[in-house]
Amino acid sequence: MVSFFKTPIFILIIFLYLNEKVICSINENQNENDTISQNVNQHENINQNVNDNDNIEQLKSMIGNDELHKNLTILEKLILESLEKDKLKYPLLKQGTEQLIDISKFNKKNITDADDETYIIPTVQSSFHDIVKYEHLIKEQSIEIYNSDISDKIKKKIFIVRTLKTIKLMLIPLNSYKQNNDLKSALEELNNVFTNKEAQKESSPIGDHGTFFRKLLTHVRTIKENEDIENKGETLILGDNKIDVMNSNDFFFTTNSNVKFMENLDDITNQYGLGLINHLGPHLIALGHFTVLKLALKNYKNYFEAKSIKFFSWQKILEFSMSDRFKVLDMMCNHESVYYSEKKRRKTYLKVDRSSTSMECNILEYLLHYFNKYQLEIIKTTQDTDFDLHGMMEHKYIKDYFFSFMCNDPKECIIYHTNQFKKEANEENTFPEQEEPNREISAYNLYLNYYYFMKRYSSYGVKKTLYVHLLNLTGLLNYDTRSYVTSLYLPGYYNAVEMSFTEEKEFSKLFESLIQCIEKCHSDQARQISKDSNLLNDITKCDLCKGAFLYSNMKFDEVPSMLQKFYLYLTKGLKIQKVSSLIKTLDIYQDYSNYLSHDINWYTFLFLFRLTSFKEISKKNVAEAMYLNIKDEDTFNKTVVTNYWYPSPIKKYYTLYVRKHIPNNLVDELEKLMKSGTLEKMKKSLTFLVHVNSFLQLDFFHQLNEPPLGLPRSYPLSLVLEHKFKEWMDSSPAGFYFSNYQNPYVRKDLHDKVLSQKFEPPKMNQWNKVLKSLIECAYDMYFEQRHVKNLYKYHNIYNINNKLMLMRDSIDLYKTHFDDVLFFADIFNMRKYMTATPVYKKVKDRVYHTLHSITGNSVNFYKYGIIYGFKVNKEILKEVVDELYSIYNFNTDIFTDTSFLQTVYLLFRRIEETYRTQRRDDKISVNNVFFMNVVNNYSKLNKEEREIEIHNSMASRYYAKTMFAAFQMLFSTMLSNNVDNLDKAYGLSENIQVATSTSAFLTFAYVYNGSIMDSVTNSLLPPYAKKPITQLKYGKTFVFSNYFMLASKMYDMLNYKNLSLLCEYQAVASANFYSAKKVGQFIGRKFLPITTYFLVMRISWTHAFTTGQHLICAFDPKGCTADCKNSAPCYKSPESFFFTHALAAEASKYLFFYFFTNLYLDAYKSFPGGFGPAIKEQTQHVQEQTYERKPSVHSFNRNFFMELANGFMYAFCFFAISQMYAYFENINFYITSNFRFLDRYYGVFNKYFINYARIKLKEITSDLLIKYEREAYLSMKKYGYLGEVIAARLSPKDKIMNYVHETNDDVMSNLRRYDMENAFKNKMSTYVDDFAFFDDCGKNEQFLNERCDYCPVIEEVEETQLFTTTGDKNTNKTTEIKKQTSTYIDTEKMNEADSADSDDEKDSDTPDDELMISRFH
């Protein structure tokens, strides 16, 4: 009882004790945490101080940087000097000029001493506002005097004056900080430039802003509701008065010669806070610089007083990598984002709410996005030159690579003096000759770069323009202040705005987005525009939209506005509707050839129009609308041409329909749109090398060729090539990659190397070496014929016949251009080309072809094809396709993608007809059928003329088809917006393995990324290209692999390196899979009636399992009532639908046969060439008394029928025990297999699930036996090797001992010494045992390790004495022995002095008794 009461007290004491310990522990932990937090806070304070100092230092690098100030001053002086010496002496000092500008801040210069005309130039004392007015004067007078002769001079002057204005603006905060040493006052002084105007306008040119926009929206609403107006978009832009096409000069400038109007534009933009954009333009460097300064003033307290947000200068931001630039921007704009290395900025940006983002951050987001694109575009373009860069390289390495290429050394040099810079074609070389580039002067020297820009930039070609911009980019990326200053006058940083027009929308549709933005702003808040907006006030999206509208739509004196001029230029001048069509034809860093360069305000117009014309601009901010707009770039452009999943029969008939209904004059119109030399370039794009008649002699006419002496007649060359592909496919599961097929003996040992996991990817250029040996062998056998030898080798080749000369030329051309030769094929249908063929035979052939195709497909319908070889001249072809692609982009209102392709095809047909001058007109001519249409004196021509004759002969029939195949590959690739992403996808590490896989077509990544096999057959190539790779029995896989190689070359031309490698790796594997798939598909569809019968039976049994009664009484087995539907349920067993034991006995029989067919089919896993050939290797010494089997191809051979039987056994076994699985396979048979898209994905599913189950089943059945056979085979082989080695060691001794002991005394071998030596020496030379050594030998087995290094001679003597030959004078000694002795004589050191006349005796037939080997008793 006492203990009962003590228990709660004891528990209470324990609880209090533990509680105290816990509290103490918590307090200790708290103290520790406080200490840690104090340490952390100390570190944070230190970091904060560093960050604070960093912020201030970053701002000082922009407005307190002495180096920047020095370089800007230097460039300012250079510009002022160049303006004074400029050949264009404008602007002139006219009456009224002094009222426009303060003439005291300008210098006046006379044009000539004899002329009273005076022009003015700015000075160092000229302010920013003075340069603004000076720019207005230059534009006014340039418009008045403009002509094509001075076009480049006007452009250059406008560029440098704009640069001078930018420099004056950049120097304002620099000079202010230098004088006052106050950061904020320097920023405010810059801000006052756009707020404190010298003369405040009393009234706006548009009156009250609110009233103006209300009237505008009412007018827009009226037009949209008016059903009589057809083109509402054009009416919104041009108004009621239709404007005709203006003079071409009117398109060069945004305004006409009216300075007052220019000033009104400046005032409008200042009122809406867009003055900075108006005066600077969309220059990526300058606009970014001032936008960052604007952000610094706006958030000065957070950046530099509260010091809570990180700040970076614009120059520093550009030094970061492309992805880090956005991270830095988010830090400056106080945004929190989650970054994924593999995700695009667009995706991460849109995941975070950016509704409160300031306009400055939006503009910086835009500038960074397109600066990154500008950087990538320049780097991508270098791939067209002799050196390659990639976007992910470190900036230092980009610089080193550039100078290593230009200067042959990573050290800087003056690139304008290097050979790389000078060697661009079609340019006058006026540079001084230097052996070594000058390295004493920096490559970024301000004077040097400005001098060459002013002197020669207008004459630069594409490559030199690229080098100049790339030089500047390397400096920017590596924080070089001189490059930062030099960039201010480079055109590429203005032109980058063109890259933002990517959507395929009409210009009027983009303008409607701007109107929607204004409508949204007007509906949300009806307020008066603040007239004193400045840099400190927020520039809202509404300010941007309304300001952009007024800037682009203001006009005077009924002169068209900027918007109207640009729209007329597109629709009336160029006759296009989409801005993207124009932009795609322009270079991003071009020279002065672009008309926009006449007036930089064109770029300002495009920039403002771009910011306000995104589709979602009315609902989102600028950056969000931009990223939502480019979201379509990730969407696959699915058209009939580009969509590889589009049903091929529909695509084929649609293509033929479009071709048939193309207007006759459309081809003529296309020719007019092309340049004058393009047709000749088209002819030179292809060169035919291997004549079709040459290949036919080894293929179709192979039976006429004489076989080599003692050898059987050779098989057709296409059959041999096809067999090689089939053989590789059969052997690939065991790891016999074809790159080792050069040596047939190595191939037998490759299976052992598979275990070492040394992967050798199947690259086509290695496989081509194997095919080359086969092709050369076939030609060599042809030239070894007796009649060919007599004609070709033993007679003058001048009188040789044309056919033999054509054969020799074809093989010589093939060997010379082996790496570039591609083989195409066409159907060989003689009856189709011969007019003498009766009509009923043609109808019969057509009916047979139809029946053959309907019940399956047209696989193997023809044995032979017309195969020919050619090469592509990639540089010329690329120029042709680029021009045609530009024509298509400019004329999308005339052409669709399909109609343009077919128009080009008809143009190629027209070119093909120009080659038909030497062809007979009658189609019955045998020469026309077999393409022997070379000139009659072909063999008498020289080599160059014969090569031209081969090309003309082949081009007369196959130019159009071959050229169009190459063109469509390039055109459809350029048309698709999916190729960039696809190329990046196959550059990832996980997909590189897919590209090199021998079964890539059964992987999800391969199918998901477009299945390059289906892309080649259904998108990249025209429909007629599928005929030879399906209908030919011999050569279809060979031709398909060449399609892959053509695709590889085309992708390489477009700089898609990963896709190029993918096609090269898959040229054999995917081509084999396609051929095997077609054969299986053909026979599979023949079983439609049988499959349907069993499906109906299965449905009836399913009904019986679920209801107990059969649906169809005919399938009710005997024993049940005749009236099955009215009988009592006797089959009801729902679980039998999933698994049934009733048919287990029958299923086991089929499982048994399935097991043994697997043994035959899977033998390749362990035995190269199969189990049979492996066994035959042990009997190679026995001559095989049988005929040589015909090489196998992808057709209905023994293996195919074994696989068919294997499939039947599998179906009968597993379909019987599981109806659910049977229905699954029925769905595949009836639906999935008939739709290519579903079939490809089912193949992947089948590999990972169904085939996985089959593999596991094989592992416990047939694979066990195959492995046992392999081990037994190797054991027998090793035992055989052991026996051979033992026999090889004993054989020489046994044979000599047998000779000594068994030879009859009466029968003496009358052999001379050298006969004996030669006999035994030859015997010993054939014995090679690799110096194997036997371990653990007993005393009686030691002889196994003895080797005979010399020819043995055995002498048998009596036990008492050994006698020598009577003629041996030097040997008189005797040796006593007790038993038979073996003596080894070194025949090489034998004393030849004893037989001086032996050499003469070798030719004698009489025996030499003195040299006989005799026995003595």
Curated annotation (Swiss-Prot):
The keyword Ribosomal protein does not apply. It is found in: Host cell membrane; Host cytoplasm; Cytoplasmic vesicle, Secretory vesicle, Rhoptry. Its main location: host cell. InterPro entries: CLAG. One of its GO terms (biological process) is adhesion of symbiont to microvasculature. The chain crosses the membrane at residues 1204-1224. Residues 1-24 form the signal peptide. Keywords: Cytoplasmic vesicle, Disulfide bond, Host cell membrane, Host cytoplasm, Host membrane, Membrane, Signal, Transmembrane, Transmembrane helix, Transport. Disulfide bonds join 333-361, 407-413, 517-545, 521-542. The keyword Nucleotidyltransferase does not apply. Residues 1383-1417 are annotated as: Disordered. GO terms for cellular component: cytoplasmic vesicle; host cell cytoplasm; host cell plasma membrane; membrane; rhoptry. Residues 1394-1411 have a biased composition (Acidic residues). It is a single-pass membrane protein; Peripheral membrane protein. Self-associates. Component of the RhopH complex. RhopH complex is at least composed of CLAG3.1/CLAG3.2, RhopH2 and RhopH3 with a 1:1:1 subunit stoichiometry. CLAG3.1/CLAG3.2 mediates subunit association through independent contacts with RhopH2 and RhopH3, which do not directly interact with one another. Interacts with RhopH2. Interacts with RhopH3. Participates in the formation of new permeability pathways in Plasmodium-infected erythrocytes enabling the uptake of nutrients from the blood plasma. Many Plasmodium falciparum strains have two highly similar paralogous genes, CLAG3.1 and CLAG3.2, that are mutually exclusively expressed. CLAG3.1 is preferentially expressed in cultured parasites. Analysis of blood specimens from 20 Plasmodium falciparum-infected symptomatic patients indicates that parasites predominantly express CLAG3.2 in natural malaria infections. CLAG3.1/CLAG3.2 expression patterns can change under different environment conditions. In Dd2 strain, CLAG3.1 activity is inhibited by ISPA-28 compound. This is Cytoadherence-linked asexual protein 3.1. The lineage of its organism: Eukaryota, Sar, Alveolata, Apicomplexa, Aconoidasida.
